[in-house]
Amino acid sequence: RTLAAGDPVRLYLLSLAAVIIQQRTAVNLAAQQNLLSYAQDGYLDALGTLLSVTRLAESRAVTTIKFTLSQALATVYTIPAGTEVTNGVVTFATDHELNIEKGKLEGSVTASCTVAGTIGNDYLAGQVNTIVKPMTFVSKAENTTITTGGSEAESDESLAERIRLAPNGFSVAGPEKAYVYHAKSVSSSVLDVSVTSPTPGEVDVYVLLAGGELPSKETLEQIDAYLSD
């Protein structure tokens, strides 16, 4: 029997075909979520738990803040951890206590942005220079390095790559990909890692951040501490 374009039977069969196609598409998509190359969002997170890999949260931009005293003192001057310095847009808080030795006029300490994400990146040296709560004897505070290292939550692409690399991290013999995996596990801002060994017992790790940026001294120190732990 030939069905005309408007035949009710033909229209009914077409409606059934649409439902069947959608169901099979949904089944195929659900099956793909079990595969690392296709998994997304929560499904990818679930695959990561099989290898104890979790999605990296947002990271905070870091910098170094230099505090300058109005005069040299006869005693040690302490600047508490959490002291905030701002540029009117973002605020950085010192990571730990800073003790300026007696007779000295200045001291430096690392500081992290109070808001996670890329919002704290790319402020040049000297741009973060206003103390939120003025302190006795402190005449000036400013960042001495460009603010870098802030990133958003880890993307599916980055997480999938770390899951692929995770088995290399089980080794304690220091294979190349183990260094890559651990370096990328420090922060979601780490885009790429290159590892070389110029001489036996010596390993050089080169890091590139998201957006093609070079890591700051503070970020490199974080990675070095993580790899040395």
Regions found by a protein language model. Give the residues of each.
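Carbohydrate-recognition loop of C-type lectin domains
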Residues: 93-95, 171-229
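N-terminal polar alpha-helical/low-complexity "assembly arms" that mediate subunit docking
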Residues: 1-178, 182-185
